[in-house]
Amino acid sequence: MAVRAQFENSNEVGVFSTLTNSYALVAVGASENFYSVFEAELQDVIPICRTTIAGTRIIGRLTAGNRKGLLVPTSTSDQELQHLRNSLPDDVRIQRIEERLSALGNVIVCNDHTALIHPDLERETEEIIADVLGVEVFRQTIADNVLVGSYMSLSNQGGLVHPKTSIQDQDELSSLLQVPLVAGSVNRGSNVIGGGMVVNDWMAVTGLDTTAPELSVIESVFRLGEGAAPGQINSSLKDTMVESFY
């Protein structure tokens, strides 16, 4: 399911929200309709936490996370950290990172298995990412841009990268990540993919300006049109498990 939304007249959905397979973060003060887009799809499935990070609402650019963990910058206040710990599932590890490049959402892109990071991140940061998120970490650029989190969106099913990414780069990244990649855009031609959308394994939210062709590319590369609601994934797995008992 891919849906379009706006955060207070902004199409940069990925700036004001973070979405994973086990939780969603939405900036506080979000106009109700923005929050309700997430609520409609996720309410009974995963917790949706309204929060600020370091007193700001650009939470999607300051945080990076997956099903297993959430990384926040060192400027995150104790109250915000406690609020996140109270709101997110107990098995999600939340870790503050002391890093010069503190807009973590711009410099890290990850799914539940792999992370691509800015080539200049500290070695210590790389180790924390691998440990907290439980992923394999690669230092990469996307179409010669070091801000991998800004120019790519990634789930366990696929990835969307900057429209000027060469075929050779796409193939290299695809083999690192072990998921299919497509070069494309969001919000009527914007190449800032990470800032313009959020995605998990069954849902994507993009800016209101995203065109129908862009939306169909998103639905196909992230395999969102395949009835992959979380409940259905579980039930199909359950069926195969039951069959294997006999």
From Swiss-Prot:
This protein's UniProt keywords: Cytoplasm, Initiation factor, Nucleus, Phosphoprotein, Protein biosynthesis, Ribosome biogenesis
Family, as annotated: Belongs to the eIF-6 family.
Annotated protein name in UniProt: Eukaryotic translation initiation factor 6
Organism superkingdom: Eukaryota
GO cellular component: cytoplasm; nucleolus
NCBIfam families in the cross-refs: eIF-6 (TIGR00323)
Organism the protein comes from: Sordaria macrospora (strain ATCC MYA-333 / DSM 997 / K(L3346) / K-hell)
InterPro entries: eIF6
